[in-house]
Amino acid sequence: MKENKKTQFPINKTLSKINKKFLELKKSDKLALMPFIMAGDPNIETTSEILLKLQEKGADLIELGIPYSDPLADGPIIQLSASRALKSGTTLKNVIQLLESLKDKLHIPIILFTYFNPVLNFGLENFCELASKVGVSGLIIPDLPLEEAYKFSEIISSYSIDLILLVAPTTPSERMKIISNNTKGFTYLVSVTGVTGERNKMENRVENLITKLQEISINPVAVGFGISSPEHVNKVRKWGADGVIIGSAFVKRISNSNEKEVVNQIGKFCEEMRKAADQ
């Protein structure tokens, strides 16, 4: 499908909560630390505790996954996490209720990561209205093509929610320019081809992609997929990224910890990543 270049994404006239967070961090020369966890794994009550612990231990933003039965962009660790969350009875409605209960306690931007089908079934406008009321700042929909994003971005933006778009190493240059200049909040740079998951090393081409994105767009660049160690985080910082997203490494620790220890274990790992981000 050809890109509809006549259609424009809406232009935000005011800074969003995510914009303000990145500007605040840039002034302090800090890398934005963004953990990802799956809502409802192991259960909604523990997710609530983990969110507050991540905020306490230095997360600047949090990406919260909505469990879905067919998560195409996710590797086995996050797929299993989604499966556990669904088995525990987690629904999109539960997640909205969870965030409502934490609205006065969570002060950092919360970004929902969801596939499009759950949102479509819920109703996009209804979903955005409820998400906005409970303090959601951003939305990532990995299976929403750019051509479809044009249609929905205006509705999403009207509720003061940033629709965050993804760029991959295989994205053609012209399309990369369109995406990075029309994303809201930041550009999500997928550091590897394929699905999410831990990797042993970061590919050096990521540095070139960060530089390229910063040359063609004023939006911050956050790197995700495959980042699992303090060394990875430190490398991303040295390469000049504005933020780092860590998913599978957090999710794996949730799955490997018993319920009594999981919150503290996640807090300790978040502290490690915070130190690496600040070095």
UniProtKB/Swiss-Prot annotation:
GO CC field: cytosol
Under catalytic activity, the entry for this protein gives: (1S,2R)-1-C-(indol-3-yl)glycerol 3-phosphate + L-serine = D-glyceraldehyde 3-phosphate + L-tryptophan + H2O
Give the signal sequence positions: none
Which pathway does this chain act in?
Answer: Amino-acid biosynthesis; L-tryptophan biosynthesis; L-tryptophan from chorismate: step 5/5
Name the PROSITE patterns on file: TRP_SYNTHASE_ALPHA (PS00167)
Keyword line: Amino-acid biosynthesis, Aromatic amino acid biosynthesis, Lyase, Tryptophan biosynthesis
**Pfam families given in the database record:** Trp_syntA
Q: What is its EC number?
A: 4.2.1.20
GO molecular function, a single term:
tryptophan synthase activity
Q: Where is the active site?
A: 63, 74
InterPro entries found in the cross-reference section? Aldolase_TIM, RibuloseP-bd_barrel, Trp_synthase_alpha_AS, Trp_synthase_suA
Report the PANTHER family cross-referenced here.
Answer: TRYPTOPHAN SYNTHASE ALPHA CHAIN, CHLOROPLASTIC (PTHR43406:SF1), TRYPTOPHAN SYNTHASE, ALPHA CHAIN (PTHR43406)
Record's subunit section: Tetramer of two alpha and two beta chains.
Primary role: The alpha subunit is responsible for the aldol cleavage of indoleglycerol phosphate to indole and glyceraldehyde 3-phosphate.
What's the family? Belongs to the TrpA family.
NCBIfam families noted in UniProt: trpA (TIGR00262)
Its name, as the record gives it, is Tryptophan synthase alpha chain
Q: Which organism is it from?
A: Prochlorococcus marinus subsp. pastoris (strain CCMP1986 / NIES-2087 / MED4)
The gene for this chain is: trpA
